[in-house]
């Protein structure tokens, strides 16, 4: 980001962790750089939620959340949140909000209040289950790599522990698959995970990047066809692990037939 600085730069927008491969930014370092150059900083904090990361305490100016994710928590509301100093928020309200006129309905506001009441316990549950899923994937012979901030083999594990109190339910991994057909076999054998690209609700989801393979959007990503993102919901860990095990075993059987 330092090399991207230009004479007319006014804002640094970052996401940490990001929502596919979960690389982190050093928030204190970014904030220090921005203040040195009189730049405003805004971070997308949906991955960690307010429970697991508070970027303002590291010097970031403003925080935005997709409240449709963890804050709502039930996949039934579309909303966003912006947090910052009262003076800044007041200026946004007076100069931007009143111009754009965007506002959530009373019912959506009530749904967010409902979600906030259970947010801490949901995040705790999601993270505990996710840690068990990561541990299972780490020992499976068909798993090539794992992306998760609190995975101890992660190159940024130390930074994650410094900035975050937890890592939530999003992770990704790559499968030792030799073809799209093998990835299709993996997807077709998932019975518990729903194939969907959103996250933050109560149900567990799988998003294999090969779903985009025939679309124009695939050309915009450098992710390999054997890449899968998982969102771990509020279910018990055992059926989720069993589901992944069955799907991976189906791939192994297909690979074995190919070798014969």
Go through each PLM region and give its residues:
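Conserved PLP-enzyme active-site core in the AAT-like
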Residues: 1-140, 147
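Conserved small-domain helix->loop->beta segment predominantly found in fold-type I
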Residues: 131-191, 197-200, 214-219, 259-260
